[in-house]
Amino acid sequence: MIPQRLVMSAFGSYAGREEIDFSQAGPGIFLVPGATGAGKTTVINLLMRFYDIDRGAIYVDGNEIRQVTRDSLRLSYTMVLQETWLFCGTVYENIAYGRIGATREEVIAAAKAARIHSYIETLPDGYNTVLSDDGVNISKGQKQLLTIARAMLSDSPMLILDEATSNVDSRTEILIGEAMNELMKGRTCFVIAHRLSTIQNADRILVIRNGNIEEQGTHDELMRAKGFYASLYNAQFE
């Protein structure tokens, strides 16, 4: 399931009204870069129906999104957010939460794909190690990798990554990047970030600025256009 057409209208501080056509797109990676406050997270809030637009429409598989129940819609998405969420329970339970009925072999395979298995093996009780509430007894990067492992188990066809490499050291960022590449295989992905280290992998890039979609295209197309995206990219990699 991928959005076939998004028309986003005025809602609160998000004053843009743009149409994004995904009708020809299959599984792929759509990066939404831009400055903080540009409206990137609003795109995700609309896709998840955390709130509804007041004008325009969002279509998913040909169905207007407001005609799809929130529960049904959200089963189609897996999210990895900047603010991770872990509960008081074992490492195994936190990963297995990604899919009801997952086997131990599947949980371990997900942890390996998420580049967190080796770390788990160093814990006092391995996968049976109990995490404190919200995982405060492990690092930010380790929490992020556990969240990615949980997402690995999900069967949902769409993935939303919101600032998934924020506030981690360079080594952990590399591990998270590798884990995300595994996670994104075969799914339609929306990656929201202003760090553009993996931007070249995106099938389509949406550049949101001041609440409007200012540019869209591939990395090469946007670099040739020499617009806001090109200036943002060059500023980060000079």
Model region roles, listed by residue range:
Residues 45-50, 74-83, 91-94, 108-116, ...:
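ABC-family ATPase nucleotide-binding domain "signature/switch" substructure
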Residues 101, 117-124:
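Conserved H-loop
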Residues 56-63, 73:
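Conserved ABC transporter NBD signature motif
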Residues 54-57, 210:
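Conserved coupling/switch loops of ABC nucleotide-binding domains, chiefly the family-specific signature
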Residues 1-42:
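Extreme N-terminal "head/tail" segments of very large remodeling/mechanoenzyme assemblies
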Residues 2, 13-14, 26, 52, ...:
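Short flexible coil/turn linkers enriched for glycine and charged/polar residues
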Residues 95, 99-100:
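A short, conserved alpha-helical patch in the ABC ATPase nucleotide-binding domain
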